[in-house]
């Protein structure tokens, strides 16, 4: 198993991944809108819709013209179509699409911020096993890299990443 602890005094060698964890059964809702990044309040409006339906988000990867919200299938159960319609009314996106069957994997390590090529190694390990990466999320702190893969590839993806860094 994987332990995630707040004790920074443990012997964590710089540049190494210290943990891999993940879960299945997520949906990613992706909104596209030209020049979305210039529209004040866009992100707040999107999150307000999720809040109004009592849905917490797991991750929120964004780009200049796209914003994705990842939530568990359990939280979205019976609400997905209503949320999609509410998003259309609230922010008038060019498109809004929900894709399910997503597993999320977190690759964690304090030293990743100074290690060149860690993300490349993650993606290479997945590519070697013919596992498509459906989503990527990495904050500027570089404490973790989040990847989304098909539910069916979850165990194989965990194994591939584990073997890359721990074998």
State what each model feature region is:
Residues 1-140, 144-167:
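C-terminal catalytic "cap/lid" subdomain
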């Amino acid at each position: 198993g994987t332990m995630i602890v707040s004790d920074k005094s443990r012997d964590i060698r710089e540049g190494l991944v210290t943990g891999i964890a993940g879960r299945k059964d997520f949906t990613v809702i992706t909104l596209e809108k030209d020049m979305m990044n210039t529209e004040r309040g866009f992100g707040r409006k999107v999150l307000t819709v999720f809040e109004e339906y009592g849905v917490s988000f797991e991750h929120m990867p964004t780009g200049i013209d796209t914003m994705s919200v990842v939530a568990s299938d359990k939280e979205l159960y019976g609400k997905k179509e209503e949320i999609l319609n509410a998003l259309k009314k609230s922010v008038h996106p060019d498109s809004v699409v929900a894709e399910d069957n997503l597993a999320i994997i977190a690759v964690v390590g304090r030293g990743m911020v100074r290690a060149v090529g860690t993300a490349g190694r993650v993606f290479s390990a997945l590519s070697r096993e013919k596992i498509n990466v459906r989503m990527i999320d990495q904050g500027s702190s570089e404490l973790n890299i989040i990847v989304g893969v098909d539910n069916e590839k979850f165990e194989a993806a965990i194994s591939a990443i584990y073997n890359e860094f721990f074998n």
